[in-house]
Amino acid sequence: MSKEQIIQAIKGMTVLELNELVKSIEEEFGVSAAAPV
């Protein structure tokens, strides 16, 4: 899957789906996507 394909998939998602995607990525890689303050 290319970066372009990933971007196209994300563009078709709802805000709720994106939120769930971010949570899944955080859990998978043990990281947080929260911006440092």
Curated annotation (Swiss-Prot):
One of its GO terms (molecular function) is structural constituent of ribosome. The keyword Zinc does not apply. It comes from the Bacteria. InterPro entries: Ribosomal_bL12_oligo, Ribosomal_bL12_oligo_N_sf. One of its GO terms (cellular component) is ribosome. It holds the Pfam family Ribosomal_L12_N. Keywords: Ribonucleoprotein, Ribosomal protein. One of its GO terms (biological process) is translation. The keyword Lipid metabolism does not apply. Homodimer. Part of the ribosomal stalk of the 50S ribosomal subunit. Forms a multimeric L10(L12)X complex, where L10 forms an elongated spine to which 2 to 4 L12 dimers bind in a sequential fashion. Binds GTP-bound translation factors. Forms part of the ribosomal stalk which helps the ribosome interact with GTP-bound translation factors. Is thus essential for accurate translation. Belongs to the bacterial ribosomal protein bL12 family. This is Large ribosomal subunit protein bL12.
